[in-house]
């Protein structure tokens, strides 16, 4: 947040800010209180900044369930430590996780768009 505030005041010209949000900002996930709360804060911060700076493109994107090292760490935990682990293992085994490259391509597509997009959006809605 401090870095983005500095960016808004110190950098001249056209500006765009994209924050990494999460669906976890909208759902209470047992064992993830800090993660859910921090992602909810990211969503609200982006929403408030967008109101304060309507001339700028400010967004928080939800990348979806992405096959990252974080996902591997989640799957390696026990049900005792994270009751929802079975769901994440199932998502991985079914092949339904999104590749990081897919998210990056979708985000680049959004950045290049000149039309209106919601402040909070899912990259799965903007595939190439």
Regions found by a protein language model. Give the residues of each.
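Catalytic Tyr-X3-Lys loop
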Residues: 1-2, 42
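Active-site helix of classical SDR
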Residues: 4, 38
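Active-site-adjacent segment of SDR/Rossmann-fold oxidoreductases
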Residues: 10, 27, 48-57
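Glycine-centered, small-residue-biased loops immediately flanking beta-strands
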Residues: 15
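Hydrophobic structural elements of the Rossmann-like NAD(P)H-binding subdomain
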Residues: 18, 58-61, 71
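Residue(s) in the substrate-gating loop at a strand-loop-helix junction
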Residues: 22
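Active-site loop immediately N-terminal to the catalytic Tyr-X3-Lys motif
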Residues: 29-33
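C-terminal helical subdomain
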Residues: 60-63, 68, 76-128
């Amino acid at each position: 947040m401090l870095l983005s505030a500095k960016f808004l005041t110190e950098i001249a010209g056209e500006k765009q800010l994209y924050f990494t949000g999460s669906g976890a900002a909208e759902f209470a996930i047992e064992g993830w209180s800090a993660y859910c709360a921090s992602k909810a804060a990211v969503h609200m911060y982006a929403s408030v900044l967008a109101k304060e700076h309507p001339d700028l493109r400010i967004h928080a994107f939800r990348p979806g369930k992405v096959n990252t090292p974080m996902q591997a760490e989640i799957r390696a935990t026990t049900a005792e430590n994270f009751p929802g682990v079975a769901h994440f293992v199932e998502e991985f085994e079914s092949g339904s996780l999104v590749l990081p490259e897919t998210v990056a391509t979708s985000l680049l597509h959004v950045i290049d768009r000149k039309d209106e997009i919601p402040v909070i959006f899912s990259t799965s809605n903007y595939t190439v």
